[in-house]
Amino acid sequence: MTWYESGGEGSRTALLLHGLGATAAVWKPVERALQERGSVRWLAADLGGHGGSDWQSFYSVGQLAAQLAELVQQQMIGEFFVVGHSLGAYVGLALASAWFGIQVRGVLGIGPKVSWPAADLQAARELATRPVRWYQTGEEALTRYRRVSGLGTDIAPGEEWLARGSVHAERGWRLAQDPRTFAVAGAPFASLVASATVPVLLARGERDPMVSLRELRMHAPQACDIPGAGHNAHIEDPGAVVGLLEHLVARV
């Protein structure tokens, strides 16, 4: 089962896909901005192994995309655009390959990490083999969630985009993430971009330490910076992200 929520109005739909370790709750600011514009509907989904979506025995970008393709077909969405953050951009590009029989019209990728040094890959693989870790308090779990999801420490604890990042059960608190999802790290970004059959627009927060503008422009010459933003531009400047989506829609 893939957890999702949807809303908004308009003849076109934006499929909002979060990054590794996060949940669909990070899209709340963008959802509000879309609601105010009133031109695009939205559907925000938890990727497999995250939030309220089912855990699987293994994970890959293709497997995550296949689950979302099934959701799109079940919801009879028709033509849609993908807005993906970090890992979500990878999954969006896979969906745009025409391998899944759905009608993606364009992909907006925000802050995808396109270069994976050997040390980063090794760290991700080690995380993927670890058992679920339990915490005594929700605050401890929240601190860990901020780190693994890339949300950082400069977001107030009560903010809605931190919602559903942890789960309370009999043994205490744990992250709402299957550790095995870290196995998706290091997928071939260039191959995914090349496989896309629709327009692709890439962007990053100008302060994002995970990817440079030069790296993005190696894959998409029109890639751009979002001024003043860091890795989580969809939270820091949702209006800019919606503006980029509208620019992409106008190109199609």
Q: Which residues fall in each region the model found?
A:
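Active-site loop/oxyanion-hole signature of alpha/beta-hydrolase fold enzymes
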Residues: 2, 31, 38-83, 243
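Flexible "cap/lid" loop of the alpha/beta hydrolase fold
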Residues: 94-98, 103-136
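Conserved alpha/beta-hydrolase catalytic His-Asp/Glu region
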Residues: 136-189
